[in-house]
């Protein structure tokens, strides 16, 4: 439908906008902070998408505004995280393994997105999209804790650049 096309257009705009500032922050060495900000934003957006299901019962116009605002913010969140994660992987690899690090990251990202879509689709099929997005939000919260507890300390301890 036209609304899904508009959703993904806004998401693409958000991704483009995020590149204007996130790259500069990563260049200043704020890699983990940029990733954390992106994770927070994506988590907020998944909770927001879940809430849109309940908001639709109350006010359809407010739901549309929230839905499209979330699209823009989701694009900013993913656009912020994606290149920062790549930089994190590359900065952990020796110079002769940088290509392998990028390839590993991109493969992991694709597999994660694919698995997430299959599981999210299954959850939505047996329950509702509200529950599927709520599940995504909960998994993002778990990933935030994992990033704080394991990934960030490991990166700061073993980074090569």
Model segments located where?
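Structural signature of the two symmetry-related core transmembrane helices
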Residues: 33-49, 137
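Residue-level signature of mid-helix packing/kink "hotspots" within the transmembrane helices
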Residues: 12-20, 113-114
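A membrane-interface helix-boundary motif in multi-pass transporters
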Residues: 122-140
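Transmembrane alpha-helical segments of major facilitator superfamily
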Residues: 6-15, 109
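Loop-to-transmembrane helix entry/capping segments in MFS-fold secondary transporters
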Residues: 1-2, 95-105
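Hydrophobic core of transmembrane alpha-helices in multi-pass small-molecule transporters
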Residues: 62-80
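Helix-to-loop junctions at the C-terminal end of transmembrane segments
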Residues: 18-31, 124
